[in-house]
From Swiss-Prot:
Protein name per UniProt: Small ribosomal subunit protein uS9m
Organism whose genome encodes this protein: Neurospora crassa (strain ATCC 24698 / 74-OR23-1A / CBS 708.71 / DSM 1257 / FGSC 987)
Domain of life the protein comes from: Eukaryota
Biased composition (Basic residues): 296-315
PROSITE patterns linked: RIBOSOMAL_S9 (PS00360)
Pfam families for this protein: Ribosomal_S9
SUPFAM superfamilies recorded: Ribosomal protein S5 domain 2-like
GO biological process: translation
Gene name linked to the record: mrp-9
InterPro entries named among the record's database cross-references: Ribosomal_Su5_D2-typ_SF, Ribosomal_uS9, Ribosomal_uS9_bac/plastid, Ribosomal_uS9_CS, Ribsml_uS5_D2-typ_fold_subgr
Length: 315
């Protein structure tokens, strides 16, 4: 009897204790969830005190300052150029830009090679001096091939960005656009031409006449003793059948008779073109308008002449 009474009292006390602990536990959980309750307005950077549904005061977070942001000491700096780790980064940047333009405008029509404008592109030495990098010849050749391919695009369809890139590869001086000034004819009907050969230089004044030729105030027969030199001096007139239609007065100096005669040929041809420009193809075929750049080769020490060596004797 006493045992059963003791057991009932013990079970009653145990149940009351568990009820108290569970109620306290649920009360603490309610407080924690209340503290963690987050509304959509609490995520805003502005406080909404006028809203009665929000309990308590909300203060906006301070603004972030990028100036005061400190970089991590072990952070890796990103290179400015994708070609930073190459041997010639500036050159490869230009090369990649050309490849990008080529991929974008590859389908544009091109003109024949004979119709493409002649342009003097920068040389390998110019690129090396401009970029300050030791560019390889093979790499520069590939780059120049892309430049010429872009330059062959039809001028009416060529975009402005391609023109800007091509201008950066052009030389400052374009020799193909330099045109020689035409020789004027003075008030007396004279045209003055200048010619050079070896160490000789000649100035020829050509005027319409009957075919008289004076060299330093003398006739051809008096000035040149050799028939070959006489024929060479007036070869420009004889090749165009104008030997009896113009009078020529020549001032020549320097060199020998052969050099003076060929210098006179070039001078007369240039002056004749001032009177009749249509004769240029005939004079070119006759070899009268192209200057001969050959000069006497100098003598070397140990040689008898420029090339000749002394006779070798075995003993």
């Amino acid at each position: 009897m006493m045992a059963s009474l003791r057991h009932s009292i013990t079970s009653a006390l145990r149940s009351s204790r568990q009820g108290c602990s569970k109620s306290a536990q649920w009360q603490s959980l309610d407080q924690q969830f209340g503290a963690l309750r987050i509304s959509s307005r609490s995520l805003s950077t502005h406080a909404h005190d006028h809203n009665p549904n929000v309990d308590g005061q909300f203060i906006a977070a301070p603004a972030l300052s990028i100036d005061n942001f400190k970089l991590h000491p072990y952070a890796r700096a990103v290179p400015v150029s994708p070609s930073y780790f190459t041997r010639t980064p500036r050159f490869y940047d230009n090369y990649l830009s050309l490849e990008k333009l080529m991929e974008e405008y590859e389908d544009l029509p091109v003109i024949p090679a004979t119709a493409v404008e002649r342009v003097a592109w920068k040389t390998l030495e110019d690129i090396r001096k401009e970029l300050g990098e030791q560019v390889k010849a093979s790499e520069f050749a590939r780059c120049l091939a892309l430049v010429k391919r872009l330059n062959s695009i039809h001028p009416d369809l060529k975009p402005q960005e391609i023109k800007d890139v091509l201008d950066s590869f052009r030389r400052n001086v374009q020799p193909f656009t330099n045109v020689a000034k035409p020789i004027p004819i003075d008030q007396f009907g004279r045209a003055c031409g200048v010619g050079k050969r070896k160490a000789s230089s000649a100035r020829a004044f050509v005027v319409e006449g009957t075919g008289e030729v004076l060299v330093n105030g003398k006739t051809l027969a008096e000035y040149f003793g050799r028939v070959h030199d006489r024929e060479s001096a007036v070869w420009a007139l004889r090749a165009t059948n104008r030997i009896d239609k113009y009078n020529v007065w020549v001032k020549v100096e320097g060199g020998g008779t052969t050099g003076q005669a060929e210098a006179i040929t070039l001078a007369i041809a240039k002056a004749l073109l001032a009177h009749e420009p249509a004769l240029k193809p005939a004079l070119r075929r006759a070899g009268c308008v192209t200057r001969d750049p050959r000069k006497v080769e100098r003598k070397k020490h140990g040689h008898v002449k420029a090339r000749k060596m002394p006779t070798w004797v075995k003993r």
